[in-house]
Amino acid sequence: MPDVPWIEKYRPRKLSEIVNQEQALEKVRAWIESWLHGNPPKKKALLLAGPPGSGKTTTVYALAHEYNFEVIELNASDERTYNKIARYVQAAYTMDIMGKRRKIIFLDEADNIEPSGAPEIAKLIDKARNPIIMAANHYWEVPKEIRDRAELVEYKRLNQRDVISALVRILKREGITVPKEILTEIAKRSSGDLRAAINDLQTIVAGGYEDAKYVLAYRDVEKTVFQSLGMVFSSDNAKRAKLALMNLDMSPDEFLLWVDENIPHMYLKPEEMARAYEAISRADIYLGRAQRTGNYSLWKYAIDMMTAGVAVAGTKKKGFAKFYPPNTLKMLAESKEERSIRDSIIKKIMKEMHMSKLEALETMKILRTIFENNLDLAAHFTVFLELTEKEVEFLAGKEKAGTIWGKTLSIRRRIKETEKIEEKAVEEKVEEEEAEEEEEEERKEEEKPKAEKKKGKQVTLFDFIKKN
């Protein structure tokens, strides 16, 4: 495969080169030009919403090239904490030292912003001095505080004709011919995702047309985790198994839990099961190193081990395969918002109780039992951990959450009363010390004339003796 990915090599450098999004681009131009004319729009953020591969990210970079902006790109999936995002945004408030280039702050995957951090990011948007552009596949999954402050620009899904035309233009520039039926199949399987179609085309051209059936057979942009597991456990072909995580909306560490849970249900012989567990053990080591060092290129080796490594471990059971969700997290039953709330609770436990993530996870399970059975104690934990109403509801359920929240109000009121008493005591102490200092000063002032008078009497006595 060529060194340079075609998706980057042939990325449009002008807005006019973007495929079939004229209506959206018209709004984008009007918005950015209001910044350039010194009259920032009322909504200082722009939200590009639409399906994958429709041109959202390409729009940002074409816009920057055409209007001479520098892009500072962040990803909500990676830079989730407010402090990190705030640091980048703060750094971008001013222009370069020479003042030649302005900056566009680009936050990709805005539909992955944690709800707990949304209010603070909204404040950053309010005080922004540079354009902020966000991209999301699902508009309604962007937190409301962010949506309310952003101008919405909707991108439509590209049709097969649009995708094929773009692929043909690339092939002409490469001087390559590909059978029409393969181009049609690529466009069909892409579901309007031009980025995915270009990647598939480059893979097929590099590997030969005999690989086309494998690449295209597993192209499913909305693939579920069950389909991904099927690709790992129903194949003994390492090359095909590696495609399991392609376009799956799940991190490698989460997918590893699913693979781990299902190995006992899929393998017949103990020695084969052991080989599969050895593969995911190595994957876990790579993931841990990536997390500790920040070197996420190690993910590639982890993914290879948890997919290809497991696939070639031995003979799987024949027939229909029923897959099971991980018991530890029960991720199947949780929506993305619920996972976000769960992660927020775990972080608060780690911070306030000085625990590791694993310890915090176990503690959260205990807290769930407490919140379901001891509402008074639950209220105290709520105040101690500074839990939100949604987090209380996550731990206790809707019926009990309201009662617990009501109890926290009285606890907070008592805390405030105690704080007021303590503040008053401190103030009284300060006033008492100040009064004592004033009395001491007054006493010193009163003693000065006496000392001087005494000194005067000594001189007079000396003179008297001298005279006599």
UniProtKB/Swiss-Prot annotation:
Q: Which intervals carry biased composition (Acidic residues)?
A: 429-444
- Binding-site residues, ATP: 50-57
Q: Its Gene Ontology biological processes?
A: DNA replication
Molecular function per GO: ATP binding; ATP hydrolysis activity; DNA clamp loader activity
The UniProt annotation puts the region (Disordered) at 422-456
Q: Which domain of life is it from?
A: Archaea
Q: Does the keyword Nucleotide-binding apply?
A: yes
A Pfam family this chain is assigned to:
RCF1-5-like_lid
**Which keywords does the record carry?**
ATP-binding, DNA replication, Nucleotide-binding
UniProt entry tagged with the keyword ATP-binding = yes
Q: What does the similarity note say? A: Belongs to the activator 1 small subunits family. RfcL subfamily.
State whether it acts alone or in a complex, and with which partners, per the record.
Heteromultimer composed of small subunits (RfcS) and large subunits (RfcL).
Which function does this protein serve? Part of the RFC clamp loader complex which loads the PCNA sliding clamp onto DNA.
> What protein does this entry describe?
Replication factor C large subunit
Species this chain originates from? Pyrococcus horikoshii (strain ATCC 700860 / DSM 12428 / JCM 9974 / NBRC 100139 / OT-3)
